[in-house]
C-alpha cells in the first residue's frame, strides 16, 4: 500500500510538473537564453563557468513562479522586464548554491560535479560573487527602487540565514523556532520575492501583491519541509545531490529535531555521524525506520501540506485564471515531489 501511495504521489507530481512548466515553457526558454546572456563575459574563465552552471540545469521553479505570478494578475509574462527579472532570481539562487556548496564541501550539484569540486573553492567563491553582481547589475537597469529594495533585503536575509546556520553546525540543541528562522531566511524569502516581484511588474494592487508575497513564503516553507524529508528518504540518483547529506554536514533538520525529542539517547550516535562525516553509528535506513516508527515523517508531511493550504488560501484574492490554477498546482508538485 505504501509503495502504491509513493508511486501515485510521484505520478501526480510528474504530471503537474509537465502542466506547470508546459504552460510557461516558451517563457522559460527565454529565461535560458537570458541566463546565457547575463552569465556571459569577455573574460574567458567567467564565460566558461557561466555556461557550466547554466548547462547544469535545475527545475527553474523560481523563474517559473515569477512568470506565473505576473500572469496571474494580468501581466504580460513574456515582457522583456519579466524575463530579465525571472533570470535574476535564478542567478541569485545559483549564486547561493555555489556558495553553499563551498561551505558544505559538497561534490555534487544537479547530478554534476559542483563548481568547487570541479574548479576549486577560490574560483567558486569568486564566481558566486560575480553572479550576485551580475544579477544586481541587471536589476538596477529596471530603475525600480521597490524591486531593488526587495532584492537587497532578500540577499541580506539569505546571507544572515547562512551565517546563523554556520553557528549551529554540529549542534544538536537546535530548537524548532531556530530551524524555521533559518528556513525562512535561506529558502522561503526567495520564493516570496519571486512572487512579489512578478506582481509588481504586472502593476498589481497592494492586496494582490501581498497575497502573492504570502503565497510565496508559505510555498517556500512547504518546499523546504519536503526537501528535508527527501534528504532522509530519497536516493542520490533522484535528488541530483548526495542523499542524507544534511546530517553529514552537521545540519539538524526538523525530522531529527523531532526524533531527538522522542529518542534523546540517540544524541551520541548522531554526534558521531556528524563528527565522522559518515553514517557509522547508525545507517540512514536505521534513522528512516525510527522516523517512520514515531510517525515523524507523516507529521512533517502534514506540516508541509498545512503550509501549502495556507498558500492556496492566499490566492483567493486573485481572479480565477489558468495561471492562478497553475500556482495552486505548484503546491501539489512541491509537496508530492520525489526530487
Question: Can you describe what each PLM-predicted range is?
Answer:
Residues 1-339:
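All-alpha prenyltransferase/terpene-synthase fold signal
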Amino acid at each position: 500500500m505504501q509503495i502504491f501511495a509513493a508511486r501515485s504521489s510521484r505520478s501526480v507530481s510528474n504530471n503537474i510538473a509537465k502542466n506547470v512548466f508546459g504552460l510557461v515553457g516558451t517563457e522559460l526558454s527565454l529565461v535560458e537564453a537570458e541566463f546565457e546572456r547575463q552569465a556571459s563575459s569577455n573574460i574567458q574563465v567567467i564565460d566558461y563557468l557561466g555556461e557550466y552552471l547554466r548547462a547544469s540545469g535545475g527545475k527553474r521553479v523560481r523563474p517559473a513562479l515569477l512568470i506565473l505570478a505576473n500572469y496571474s494578475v494580468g501581466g504580460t509574462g513574456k515582457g522583456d522586464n519579466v524575463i530579465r527579472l525571472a533570470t535574476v532570481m535564478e542567478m541569485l539562487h545559483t549564486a547561493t548554491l555555489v556558495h553553499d556548496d563551498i561551505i558544505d564541501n559538497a561534490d555534487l550539484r544537479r547530478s554534476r560535479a559542483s563548481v568547487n569540486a570541479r574548479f576549486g573553492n577560490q574560483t567558486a567563491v569568486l564566481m558566486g560573487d560575480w553572479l550576485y553582481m551580475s544579477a544586481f547589475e541587471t536589476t538596477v537597469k529596471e530603475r525600480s527602487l521597490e524591486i531593488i529594495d526587495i532584492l537587497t533585503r532578500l540577499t541580506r536575509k539569505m546571507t544572515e540565514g547562512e551565517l546563523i546556520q554556520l553557528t549551529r553546525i554540529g549542534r544538536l540543541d537546535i530548537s524548532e523556532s531556530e530551524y524555521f528562522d533559518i528556513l525562512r531566511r535561506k529558502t522561503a524569502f526567495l520564493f516570496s520575492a519571486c512572487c512579489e516581484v512578478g506582481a509588481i511588474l504586472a502593476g498589481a494592487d497592494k492586496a494582490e501583491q501581498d497575497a502573492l508575497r504570502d503565497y510565496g513564503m508559505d510555498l517556500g516553507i512547504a518546499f523546504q519541509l519536503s526537501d528535508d524529508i527527501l534528504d532522509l528518504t530519497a536516493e542520490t540518483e533522484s535528488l541530483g545531490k548526495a542523499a542524507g547529506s544534511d546530517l553529514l554536514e552537521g545540519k539538524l533538520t526538523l525530522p531529527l529535531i523531532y526524533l531527538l525529542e522522542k529518542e534523546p539517547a540517540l544524541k551520541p550516535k548522531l554526534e558521531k555521524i556528524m563528527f565522522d562525516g559518515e553514517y557509522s553509528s547508525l545507517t540512514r535506513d536505521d534513522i528512516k525506520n525510527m522516523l517512520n516508527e514515531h510517525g515523524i515523517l507523516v507529521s512533517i508531511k502534514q506540516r508541509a501540506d498545512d503550509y501549502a493550504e495556507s498558500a492556496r488560501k492566499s490566492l483567493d484574492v486573485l481572479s480565477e485564471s489558468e495561471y492562478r490554477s497553475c500556482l495552486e498546482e505548484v503546491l501539489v508538485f512541491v509537496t508530492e515531489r520525489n526530487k
